[in-house]
Every structure is written in structure tokens, then in C-alpha cells.
Regions:
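Amphipathic alpha-helical transducer elements in NTP-driven molecular machines
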Residues: 34, 48-51, 61-70, 84-98, ...
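Generic signal for short, ordered secondary-structure residues
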Residues: 16, 33, 69, 73, ...
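Conserved Switch II/interswitch segment of TRAFAC-class P-loop GTPases
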Residues: 42-47, 74-84, 95-163, 176-189, ...
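C-terminal-of-GTPase-core extension/linker across diverse P-loop GTPases
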Residues: 3-8, 13, 19, 150-358, ...
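Conserved G1/Walker A P-loop phosphate-binding module
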Residues: 1-115, 126, 151
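Short, surface-exposed linear patches
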Residues: 64-67, 90-94, 101, 125-136, ...
């Protein structure tokens, strides 16, 4: 199960530089707008110290990390919803991702170009955020307006149950968008959420803000005025802010583990910005990790929190879900505490879970099935 997050922002805020650091893909990061036209998609491993510890304990032939995907979507400019810049192509790319990572420039650099009509040295995080959000809102409003009249007609004339339910949802969304607010600010019940999901709206997607600061300021970002502004706005959306230096992260991505540790220590950091971003993205999408562990392989698997054991088994293979019998389960903490599966069992901590078991982050599972 791959997390899919689209990296968005105005031209030259550091999107492609960040993407390069995440994926080590070397995507073009030229200093001019629209250096990225087709989205770059990178699948990256999720760093997890638990996977490393399990490998140390079990000593398998192979270790496999779970993965997630980032898409570097070319810079959006004011008027994108009307086709400005490379407009609707970018919005269509954003529509396909599960979450939005919104990169905001929070550093001064006279050598970095800005979008047309903005001086290179002028930094205004709030204006940048507003520009992006407004384009997404306008794109959603266009989508809603296209559906509104047609669904209303069917709902009123044919009394179709599904159309009536959808029209009710459209009536909730339309005025909110018209007032310049994102659809994610609306509370929907469970049935309404199913309808909203089918609308593929941009402003219902969860958002994570990335404040891209200079290398000199990344170790102590709390006093940066730009970062304070971004955090204040993000709080109004219950969104998280991750502070990174994309340029520093790109340098770090080229180093081996030993040099990486020394580089981070020299900068006054205890972890990379990419690791922080990964954790934040996981939290944003409500994801967790369970493990399968044996002599041949130790592997991490991504799951949506709240799923039951059969659905977790289905992540490995559909046959596991269809023929699910039970899941022999222990927690990561118990395995580390007792040192082996045998010791966990002797301590009475090895469990057999059935079809109603809600999988927990850090579970180590062996699925029993019959097809």
C-alpha cells in the first residue's frame, strides 16, 4: 500500500529540490518556472528503526521496507484554474493524489526567481498559500457547478435516492467554496463522506505544509517570522507544519549513513527533514505499519489505521483475505522485550486474533488462511 502525496507550490519554492532529496531521482531543478512539466513520481522507502531492530533480532536473508509515493507537480501560478501557466494539467495531477504537501518559501534569496509580477527578493508566505488555495477552491467550484444543475434536475424530477443525497452534499459544499473556504472545513457524516470521495475534490484532501527555510536557519526555526506565519495559518486548518531546508536535504541525500550523521550533527539536527516529513505524511493519512517476520524475510507493510485483520492480510495477497482463518500476532515491543517469538509465547503474550481484530501499529503478524 503506497502513500501518494503530491508536492505542490508556486514556481521556485523548492519543490523539485525537495523531491530530489526524497527520491534521489535527480529531477531537473532549474531556476526558472515550469522546469517540471510532467509530474515526477518517486516511490521511496519509509525509514523505520523497528524494521532495523527486527532484522537485528531475527537475522533474515532479506529486509524489505514499506514504501510510499511522492509526486512532484509543476508550479501552479495565479489563474491556474482558468488554464494560466500550465493550469488544468497540474490540477488534474493533484486530483489523483491522496494528500497534498504544500511547499512554501520561507527564506530570502535574491538569486531565486519568482512568478511573474513578483520581485525575487519579496517573500510573502501567506500570499503564496492564498494563491495556491484559491486556485484549488476555484477548480473545485467549477467541478461542483458542472454537477449541480444536472444532479438537481434528477433529484427534483425523478426523486432518485442517490441523486437526492448527492444534491444535499453539493448544497453544503457550494456556498463554502463561494466564500473562499476549502471543502475540508465542512463536517460530513459517514454517508456524506462516501459521496464526497466520489467527487474527487481538491480541497477535501488533507494538507501538510512544508516551510522551506535556509540551511543557516533550519536548526532553530521557531524565531523565523515566515515560519511563525505559516504555523499560525496551518493551525486554522488543523494542519501540521514541517520545517526543512530543501537545499540541505538534497545534499544529505547524496551522503552515506556515516557522513549523513556527521552532517546532521554539524547542522545541529538529530534527524533529517525527509524523516520528519515521512512521519508527518503517515500521520496525515492515518497510516500505520505492521510486520511479517521470518528467517527468509522481514518486511514492513503499510495499512490504514482502523482496518481489521483480514483486510490487513489482503494487503499481502487477496487470497490471504479471502481464506483468512486467524492471525498469530505479537507486538513489536513484546518481541524486543523478550527477544524471540518462543519467549513471547512462553510469557503468554503471543495471541491468535480473529476476523474482528483491529490491527495495531507495530503488530508482527503471521496469517493463517485456506483457499
Amino acid at each position: 500500500m503506497a502513500l501518494t502525496a503530491g508536492i505542490v507550490g508556486l514556481p521556485n519554492v523548492g519543490k523539485s529540490t525537495l523531491f530530489n532529496a526524497i527520491t534521489k531521482a535527480g529531477a531537473e531543478a532549474a531556476n526558472y518556472p515550469f522546469a517540471t512539466i510532467d509530474p515526477n513520481v518517486g516511490r521511496v522507502e519509509v525509514p523505520d528503526v523497528r524494521l532495523d531492530k527486527l532484522t537485528e533480532l531475527i537475522k533474515p536473508q532479506k529486509k524489505v521496507a514499506t514504501t510510499f509515493e511522492f509526486t512532484d507537480i509543476a508550479g501552479i501560478v495565479k489563474g491556474a484554474s482558468k488554464g494560466e501557466g500550465l493550469g488544468n494539467k497540474f490540477l488534474a495531477n493533484i486530483r489523483e493524489v491522496d494528500a497534498i504537501v504544500h511547499v512554501v518559501r520561507a527564506f530570502d534569496d535574491e538569486n531565486v526567481m519568482r512568478e511573474q509580477g513578483r520581485e525575487s527578493s519579496f517573500v510573502d508566505p501567506m500570499a503564496d498559500i492564498e494563491t495556491i488555495n484559491l486556485e484549488l477552491i476555484l477548480a473545485d467550484l467549477e467541478s461542483i457547478n458542472k454537477r449541480y444543475a444536472r444532479v438537481e434536475k434528477v433529484a427534483r424530477t425523478q426523486k432518485d435516492k442517490d441523486s437526492v443525497a448527492e444534491f444535499h452534499v453539493l448544497q453544503k459544499i457550494k456556498p463554502v467554496l463561494e466564500n473562499g473556504l476549502s471543502a475540508r472545513t465542512i463536517e460530513f457524516d459517514e454517508e456524506e463522506q462516501k459521496i464526497v470521495k466520489r467527487l474527487f475534490l481538491l480541497t477535501t484532501k488533507p494538507v501538510l505544509y512544508v516551510a522551506n527555510v535556509s540551511e543557516d536557519e533550519v536548526a532553530d526555526p521557531d524565531n523565523i517570522e515566515y515560519v511563525q506565519q505559516i504555523r499560525k495559518f496551518a493551525a486554522t486548518e488543523n494542519a501540521e507544519v514541517v520545517v526543512i531546508s530543501a537545499r540541505a536535504e538534497e545534499e544529505i541525500s547524496e551522503l552515506d549513513d556515516e557522513d549523513k550523521t556527521e552532517f546532521l550533527e554539524a547542522m545541529g539536527l538529530n534527524e533529517s527533514g525527509v524523516d520528519k516529513l515521512t512521519r508527518a505524511a503517515y500521520h496525515l493519512l492515518g497510516l500505520g505499519t505492521y510486520f511479517t517476520a521470518g528467517e527468509k524475510e522481514v518486511r514492513a507493510w503499510t495499512f490504514k489505521r482502523g482496518i481489521k485483520a483480514p483486510q490487513a492480510a489482503g494487503i499481502i495477497h487477496s487470497d490471504f483475505e479471502k481464506g483468512f482463518i486467524r492471525a498469530v500476532t505479537m507486538s513489536y515491543d513484546d518481541l524486543v522485550k523478550y527477544g524471540s517469538e518462543k519467549a513471547v509465547k512462553e510469557a503468554g503474550r503471543l495471541r491468535e486474533e480473529g476476523k474482528e481484530y483491529i490491527v495495531q501499529d507495530g503488530d508482527i503478524m503471521e496469517f493463517r488462511f485456506n483457499v
